[in-house]
Amino acid sequence: MKLLLILACVIACACGERYCAMKDDTGLSCRNSTASACESCFNGGDLIWHLANWNFSWSIILIIFITVLQYGRPQFSWFVYGIKMLIMWLLWPIVLALTIFNAYSEYQVSRYVMFGVSIAGAIVTFVLWIMYFVRSIQLYRRTKSWWSFNPEINAILCVSALGRSYVLPLEGVPTGVTLTLLSGNLYAEGFKIAGGMNIDNLPKYVMVALPSRTIVYTLVGKKLKASSATGWAYYVKSKAGDYSTDARTDNLSEQEKLLHMV
């Protein structure tokens, strides 16, 4: 930090006016100085003043942001993950409010170019916000899962077993899906999704729901050990369409369940 101040002061010496790094006793503005100690002064300006007085606070804020972004996943901490989701949900209205306020401010001082840029930014932010809600509602319509409103999620794996529907959020569409059964616990993509399972409970197909369509994966191979309720089953893509992942079980065959439309 001292080196940066010395460098800034050297630039200030070449440019002219210099200001001390510390604030004066009567206000928030930097104190004008003609002292010869170059390292205690730097070039005047709002940005430099802000960095000099708030660099520690910003470093703490950025450390928190890094922690939230890096460890904001359910497998690490649900609390940190909740903070991350809250930040992502609040970004759209905050940015929209800031761009509208900036557009109003620029219009008041007749800076029409910046006014136009602010309006364009507000429109882009609003469109992105609407697109998020549209895609989330489309995904929720197929899965009935609140994971649909996660801004990071674009696909949801749906597995029907034991008369229940289990879901797992995915970042993309997999080529194939592997279900692993370990001592009665069912795992998908390395995550536990159900317990108390046996080999007879494994489904003949699983689904991956997207906002625009549902992809059906059909069982093509499995290796199971009944005595220990352990094994695996592999599913590959077979068809895609406007299917519901919430398949009914009342007097319907497997084919009828599969073709149960949204």
Swiss-Prot record:
GO cellular component: host cell Golgi membrane; membrane; viral envelope; virion membrane
PROSITE patterns assigned to the protein according to its UniProt record, in alphabetical order: COV_M
Interaction with N protein as annotated region, ranges: 237-252
Compartments, as annotated in UniProt: Virion membrane; Host Golgi apparatus membrane
GO MF annotations, alphabetized: structural constituent of virion
Positions in the Virion surface compartment: 18-47, 99-112
InterPro entries noted in UniProt: ALPHA_CORONA_M, M_CoV
Keywords: Glycoprotein, Host Golgi apparatus, Host membrane, Membrane, Transmembrane, Transmembrane helix, Viral envelope protein, Viral matrix protein, Virion
Sequence ranges on the Intravirion membrane side: 69-77, 134-262
TM spans (from-to): 48-68, 78-98, 113-133
Topology in membrane: Multi-pass membrane protein
Main location: virion
Residues with attached carbohydrate: 32
Annotated function: Component of the viral envelope that plays a central role in virus morphogenesis and assembly via its interactions with other viral proteins.
Self-association and partners: Homomultimer. Interacts with envelope E protein in the budding compartment of the host cell, which is located between endoplasmic reticulum and the Golgi complex. Forms a complex with HE and S proteins. Interacts with nucleocapsid N protein. This interaction probably participates in RNA packaging into the virus.
UniProt-listed HAMAP family: ALPHA_CORONA_M
Family statement: Belongs to the alphacoronaviruses M protein family.
Protein name (Swiss-Prot/TrEMBL): Membrane protein
Lineage: Viruses, Riboviria, Orthornavirae, Pisuviricota, Pisoniviricetes
Gene: M
